[in-house]
């Protein structure tokens, strides 16, 4: 393996077999957040809506929220029985329950893409049962959900939101497109997208996570795509959940300049502590723009007085990265690097950290939202002598008990039993919840334009510790148009002595500790206080929701 930029006797196994579960979890970790590892390089692009259409117009015409009605009695709004008058929110035990909207009869003559007077059609993507990546995902997470069980669970979730969210008298019709190839098969993905588009839906939910041509094809046809693989310019129809690389750069810039700039090395090994910090950077190429984004972060840091003396961007190589590791470690060590900024994967970092130990070089490893490295399972793949010097930021919340999963609680509350595809629930519910929230707030005339308008008018979801906060539009990021979702991050550090159950359900030694009980921070909230490697207030996982994050207790429709 070569950087794209610089400044035993065990039977032989194929690289994919050797690393298959790990590569799959790179996908899963993004799926848990509801979006793709193939992230958009920059989500601030030209908006294809009319140039004279303002980005922030408030809610679309016909939408009356609970708070609007309380502020203006002349609206004379009526709300459905599914509204809780105590909270003004939809009456379900769901952390992301939106504000109630008033009952409005749709115009019987209105039609839109995938919309009639009494129906609205969506297409849900399903994996191919024989997809080797889907099989690896199931093996890695230890569940045996079938595609049919995933389908049944999705329909069960649609049923819940259909009953409680405002669809303005329309029944949501669900059709499915099952992948004809593996998740990384671009040819199959494009053909499947054409098939989905031919169904003429109002929206498509999900997609093959390693084939962004799926999203691009739907985008080219003007079809709304929710939690689909990321593309460079999502405006105005594609909505993701994971932060863009540009947004992650802003977090990294603010974190480094606030907490590490002009300070002595404190958390390294060997003879590095006490020296002035000298920075290097390692970035995994996640999109065609990754190298450019890495260069922009380096330039932005240097503009703030933080020199990055060595800078490497690399591609994931399932066959290993020994040659790259040797040259990279040698270059950084000879350049006097004390602190390495890492946005990488555990496969490559496994080779790099083992080489660093071999060369007796123990720098600080600062994670700037890496892929899988910020999970306990991923951390098992790197050299422990090195990783005890690791800390940084992540958009993933700590691991938690299944009962803390908002969708698990909601499904069991409504249906009276756990979801059929319990193991993969985190892979299936976010896009459904996001779509119905957009529909709930888009008003009686749902179109890609009114849905976008609703998403941009919707305020950021509540700040929490068990869940990230999501927002779309221009309220954050200095007014840049945001088509991604997650905006706040946690701070964490690696504790080599902690024992925990990892994401596979395995008992492991070595776990991440989350600063201040997993408190989350917007990009402009990072301060100069550095509490990594301080056990006071740190937690390795969430075992219960904080009192302020408890959801209301409503009678179950299933009885009991």
Regions found by a protein language model. Give the residues of each.
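C-terminal region of N-terminal signal peptides and the immediate post-cleavage residues
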Residues: 32-55
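N-terminal extracellular/periplasmic Venus flytrap/periplasmic-binding protein-like
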Residues: 51-188, 192
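Beta-alpha junction/loop-to-helix N-cap segments that form part of ligand/metal-binding clefts
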Residues: 148-155, 163-245, 314-323, 350
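Extracellular/periplasmic periplasmic-binding protein-like sensory domains
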Residues: 355-430
């Amino acid at each position: 393996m070569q950087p794209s930029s610089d400044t035993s006797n065990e039977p032989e196994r194929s690289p994919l077999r050797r690393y298959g579960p790990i590569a799959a979890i790179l996908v899963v970790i993004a799926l848990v957040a509801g979006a793709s590892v193939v992230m958009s390089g920059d989500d601030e692009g030209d908006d294809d809506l009319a140039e004279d259409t303002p980005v922030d117009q408030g809610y679309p015409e016909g939408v009356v929220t609970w708070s609007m009605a309380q502020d203006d009695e002349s609206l004379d709004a009526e709300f459905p029985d599914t509204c809780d008058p105590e909270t003004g929110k939809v009456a379900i035990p769901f952390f992301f329950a939106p504000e109630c909207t008033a009952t409005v009869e749709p115009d019987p003559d209105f039609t839109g893409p995938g919309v009639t007077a009494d129906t609205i059609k969506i297409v849900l993507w399903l994996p191919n049962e024989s997809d080797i990546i889907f099989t690896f995902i199931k093996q890695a997470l230890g569940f045996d959900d079938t595609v049919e069980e995933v389908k049944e669970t999705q329909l069960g979730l649609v049923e819940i939101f259909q009953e409680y969210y405002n669809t303005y008298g329309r029944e949501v019709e669900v059709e499915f497109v099952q992948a004809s190839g593996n998740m990384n098969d671009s040819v199959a993905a494009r053909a499947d997208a054409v098939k989905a588009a031919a169904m003429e839906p109002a929206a498509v939910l999900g997609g093959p996570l390693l084939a962004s041509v799926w999203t691009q094809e739907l985008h080219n046809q003007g079809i709304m795509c929710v939690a689909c693989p990321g593309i460079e310019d999502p405006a105005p129809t594609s909505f993701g959940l994971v932060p863009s690389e540009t947004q992650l750069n802003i977090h990294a810039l603010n974190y480094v300049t606030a907490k590490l700039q002009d300070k002595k090395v404190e958390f390294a090994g060997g003879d590095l502590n006490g020296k002035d910090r000298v920075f290097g950077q390692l970035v995994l190429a996640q999109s065609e723009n990754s190298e450019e984004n890495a260069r922009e972060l380096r330039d932005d840091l240097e503009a703030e007085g933080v020199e990055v003396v060595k800078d490497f961007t690399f591609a994931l190589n399932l066959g290993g990265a020994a040659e790259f590791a040797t040259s990279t470690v040698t270059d950084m060590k000879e350049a006097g690097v004390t602190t390495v900024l890492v946005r990488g994967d555990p496969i490559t970092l496994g080779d790099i950290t083992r080489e660093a130990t071999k060369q007796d070089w123990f720098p600080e490893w600062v994670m700037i939202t890496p892929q899988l490295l910020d999970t306990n399972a991923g951390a098992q793949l790197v050299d422990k002598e090195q990783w005890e010097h690791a800390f940084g930021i992540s958009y993933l919340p700590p691991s938690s008990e299944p009962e803390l999963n908002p969708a698990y609680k909601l499904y069991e509350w409504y249906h009276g039993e756990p979801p059929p595809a319990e193991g993969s629930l985190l892979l299936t519910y976010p896009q459904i919840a996001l779509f119905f929230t957009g529909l709930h707030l888009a008003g009686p005339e749902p179109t890609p334009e009114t849905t976008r308008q609703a998403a941009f008018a919707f305020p950021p979801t509540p700040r929490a510790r068990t869940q990230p906060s999501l927002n779309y539009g221009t309220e954050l990021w200095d007014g840049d148009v945001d088509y991604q979702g997650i905006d706040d991050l946690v701070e964490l550090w690696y504790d080599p002595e902690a024992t925990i159950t990892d994401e596979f359900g395995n008992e492991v030694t070595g776990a991440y500790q989350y600063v201040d009980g997993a408190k989350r921070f917007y990009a402009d909230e990072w301060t100069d206080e550095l509490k990594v490697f301080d056990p006071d207030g740190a937690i390795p996982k969430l075992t219960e929701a904080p009192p302020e994050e408890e959801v209301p207790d409503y009678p179950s429709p299933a009885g009991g």
